[in-house]
Amino acid sequence: MRLSPVEKEKLFLFMAGELAKQRMDRGLKLNYPEAVAILSCYVLEGAREGKSVSELMKDGKHVLSTEDVMEGVPEMLEEIQVEATFPDGVKLVTIHEPIQ
């Protein structure tokens, strides 16, 4: 299987997101990279499902709470930006203050 660099990046991100979900399901608090992975996967999968940029920006704030992550992570993650492929092209999705 031959993957482009962008496809490889999305695959690694998906794998990191799945690992983070497993850890969260076991009751572990997520660190910074795990939180970024889960939020990024949410955006990529949401775009694939046909959600709009505005829906993802709004709903992305409710994916993780401060109780899901380690101390200090919400302050380190002021915003997240993900390039996602929508039916009408690639768009940048920005979620401000994604962990509340």
Curated annotation (Swiss-Prot):
Molecular function terms in GO for this entry? nickel cation binding; urease activity
**GO terms for biological process?**
urea catabolic process
Q: Which cysteines are joined by disulfide bonds?
A: none
Protein family membership: Belongs to the urease gamma subunit family.
For the protein in the UniProt heading, the enzyme class is hydrolase
The EC number on file is: 3.5.1.5
Q: Which parts of the chain are coiled coil?
A: none
Question: What's the protein called, per UniProt?
Answer: Urease subunit gamma
Keywords, ordered alphabetically = Cytoplasm, Hydrolase
Q: Which reaction does it catalyse?
A: urea + 2 H2O + H(+) = hydrogencarbonate + 2 NH4(+)
What Pfam family is a match for this entry? Urease_gamma
Question: Where is the secretion signal located?
Answer: none
The compartments listed are: Cytoplasm
Supply one GO CC term from the record.
Answer: cytoplasm
Annotated pathway: Nitrogen metabolism; urea degradation; CO(2) and NH(3) from urea (urease route): step 1/1
The annotated subunit structure for this chain is: Heterotrimer of UreA (gamma), UreB (beta) and UreC (alpha) subunits. Three heterotrimers associate to form the active enzyme.
